[in-house]
Regions:
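Gly/Pro-rich interdomain helix-loop hinge
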Residues: 130-198
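Short glycine/serine- and small hydrophobic-enriched flexible loop segments
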Residues: 57-64, 80, 84-88, 107-108, ...
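A short glycine/serine-rich beta->alpha loop
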Residues: 41-42, 110-114, 127-134
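Oxyanion-binding "anion nests"
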Residues: 74-125
Length: 200
């Protein structure tokens, strides 16, 4: 539904193919209006990419060293909404209720991310976008499963918060996330990587 930019002070600029994050108090909005009607015409590819960007925001906020209880609750709510409503939205793109739920999920994850900043998945995403043309949300979510696996091993307590939001345990968090991504046909959005014929 969006990138969460309506509720944070972050932006991106491109310079000769390089992508940079910028931040400033003047980028923070004074008023936010969420109108799901504006999302009804979004194509499936953009719907999926922005939703996975929001999901990445929520995951990264939870395992972020700057996390706090409020961030946790916002992120949990966002994860639950995305898990439930993204598949429904893909099948019923003009359904206003589903669009509203996805927009709210993006908004909540955006607030969480604005308090913690992003983490490794976003950092890795930049070259994936600049070198191979992956859309931002697809690039961010490409490494979610692997980073989840690392967090389960090294910080199981934080990982369990994500697992509970996904309706699973730490033991099957990676497979649960993979199943969710397969359900929304995630592989179909990886064509730029496949075309690049990357072997390692």
């Amino acid at each position: 539904s969006g990138t969460g930019s309506e509720i944070n002070s972050w932006g991106t600029v491109w310079n000769n193919g390089d992508k940079y994050s910028i931040s400033g108090k003047d980028l923070m909005p004074k008023t936010v209006i969420l109108d799901a009607n504006l999302c009804k015409s979004m194509p499936t590819s953009l719907t999926v990419s922005t939703a996975l960007d929001a999901l990445s925001h929520a995951f990264e906020a939870i395992w972020n060293k700057n996390h706090n209880p409020i961030v946790d609750e916002l992120s949990i709510a966002a994860i639950k909404k995305i898990k439930k409503y993204l598949p429904l939205t893909i099948k019923n793109k003009s359904n206003l209720k589903y669009r509203k739920e996805m927009q709210l999920a993006s908004f909540l994850a955006g607030i969480a991310m604005s308090k913690t900043k992003t983490a490794i998945c976003h950092s890795i995403s930049y070259p994936l976008t600049s070198l191979y043309g992956l859309s931002h949300g697809i690039a961010c979510s490409l490494t979610l499963s692997e980073v989840c696996k690392l967090n389960v091993k090294h910080n199981p307590q934080r990982a369990s918060i994500i697992s509970q939001a996904m309706g699973c345990t730490n033991m099957n968090l990676e497979s649960s996330l993979t199943k969710f991504l397969m359900n929304i046909k995630y592989g179909s959005y990886l064509k730029p990587i496949k075309d690049a014929n990357i072997n390692n």
